[in-house]
């Protein structure tokens, strides 16, 4: 393969030499390479991808010990070995080794878990590897772009990301978006023999090309090392920083108070004071927090993949959990995208033409390979798909693009005459044919008739090309006919939309079809018919009642929009974001990319173009809306795990810092830093399992509310600190436990008090996770077996230490099984109010605690279906009101809507509109018959024999 070394060394300018010389230099033809030749060239040029920087495993491992939380622990280790060297005692080697072990254990667990999650994520992303059509062994096949080599012939079509630097072969000019490479905002025209760059996007046209450079030798590859790889600090990282700073500030406050009291006022010994400071530093820092949250998110992304959603950006999970508006395409998402044509409804407008000829012309204007849904439906109506090209010679095919919205074929018939056939959007075909006003009115009447039945219209036209040239304008176009296309809704779409509304996600239909079709589809799916034409987005709607409504409010309250172009999608997302909505947007085409990138969660649907996938945050591998709603539920469960852990981490910091601070200052009892290390190690081992814990998703959109996290953490942590102080006071200054439980007093046994205090802190600290992980009573929501097992094992270890340990260096001596039983009982009794505190702080923070109390909407109930009765009553009232059985509901002085957030109002309004639409279905003959049958108790089979519905 030495003859190709000059290509690899780039000693030949393949961009400027004539195309004939390109083939000579690359030793190839327009028929492409053979598989063997391509394999040899792959060995010479390497894979068509950029070299990945391999991160050192050692540096990655050490990176887990290089963050603000780890720095605090490292300062504590230095204090144990340096500052603790005083008071006639040697350096605190045990604590130093313990802290280092804690850091190593945490880093090891984090390294293993994140490495596994990273491998899983890499495997998922491999499924999104760009693919391309390549000609090898004289056959076209779809292959991964990484196997391309110079000399390969590839096919480029609308929406493709160019896989390698290439020169265009014969064909029509392309429109190429090079903005990601050159910064040009307007697509540039590329003619045959021009070069196209790897990474640019085909915006219009279709052509074949020969690859001239791959991998690091491409224009993109050479520029890659110049790209600034500085990582932006995302919202998730800011949240972690805020929580970490809160914990560090809490510890700093405790340390300052201890320093001000212990040395100037109490005149404590230097070494004892250092030990107390170490307790706060070691016990208060949630050292495992960054790893737990990152691993939870990575593990969650794998679960999403199993449900048919690949996350390209991990932080999209938290945004998906907070999504309250979903703008979704009708075709393929709400419907099956399996079109059928009703031959009986075909309208013919050309004289002397039958319906079969309309079908034939439409089939000729369709592809017979690489078909889209419309092409497949049209060609499939023929008795034999080969009829589409029978007796004619194809000269040129004009592919579909979002601007022209039509396809066309130039062909020569058996008599040598040249013709063109075109099919496409009726409005585009009408303009093409330059139809008179009366014809337009007739066509629009047929279109409206189709639309009322939920049918899309496809216009067909023909033209004679007297010049007999493929680029000739030809004679006048003639409108031939209209075809009705029906795309049935998915069987699960209606139920999925209802689920979405109940989850607080307002689903808006975005369709390029007519308004009447959008309304009919919305009616069938029960999502409401409050839909508007795309002109309403620009304030051009003629309806005076809508004209007075601000565009932002119109978009917010609409159930959908029809006649939408890609630029309208961008405007919808932009306006919704201005109204503080977290907006999801689905898309599949190259022109959807700006809206997908603008949306908080860009979702590329199944079979989306490379450009749409590149701009999206989540790529679906399964069709339908149900995949998205399942992903929302999974994301909320993942987010709940992360939020619950952060509340737990803040609570533990408050509980350790203030609990031990008060004990140290009031009773001058010096808790052992080594025992705090044991608590921290056991805690981290247990908490690492939270990423796999079973979790109920939030019933409403959720997001990081730091005020709620800090408030809940302070209340729960403060309560636990108080219970520890009370326990120590009763144990040291009274005989309560010995009098009532028969255990020996410990007031004069500080080593055994250390053991008892250690066990009490360990049990109640770890048990707190069961409170923070549940939305209702903690005992009613069963945790995962892994979390439960880890808790049991950790507390068995803690109990055995408290009962049997005799470690002089840690100043601890076993307190016996009697005290262990007392401590477990005390911990159980003090655990019960934690749920009540959780409910209390939640209702106080919601701002409607008094209203909830008056209307009995509290969590202090054993009912499983919370709020079910009220929803059923609202449903019954809506039915009675609709049928005139009772007047419309009057406002209550405690109007629920006035107290709910605006987002909940919008979801509720959409839900009610959907309910009304479904209830209108009752006013049909079938609904009336079934109602009478139920009322009279008649035989339904007998009734159905006499009524045809």
UniProtKB/Swiss-Prot annotation:
Active-site residue numbers: 329 (4-aspartylphosphate intermediate)
GO BP terms in the entry: proton export across plasma membrane; proton transmembrane transport; regulation of intracellular pH
Main enzyme class: translocase
Catalyzed reactions per annotation: ATP + H2O + H(+)(in) = ADP + phosphate + 2 H(+)(out)
GO molecular-function terms, A-Z: ATP binding; ATP hydrolysis activity; metal ion binding; P-type proton-exporting transporter activity
EC number from the UniProt entry: 7.1.2.1
Region named Interaction with 14-3-3 proteins: 947-949
Reported tissue expression: Expressed in guard cells and leaves.
Gene Ontology CC: one annotated term: plasma membrane
Descriptive protein name: ATPase 5, plasma membrane-type
Subunit (UniProt): Binds to 14-3-3 proteins. The binding is induced by phosphorylation of Thr-948. Binding to 14-3-3 proteins activates the H(+)-ATPase.
Keyword Metal-binding annotated: yes
Residues with the N-acetylserine modification: 2
Binding residue positions for Mg(2+): 588, 592
Cited function: The plasma membrane H(+) ATPase of plants and fungi generates a proton gradient that drives the active transport of nutrients by H(+)-symport. The resulting external acidification and/or internal alkinization may mediate growth responses.
PANTHER family given in the database record: CALCIUM-TRANSPORTING ATPASE
Superkingdom of source: Eukaryota
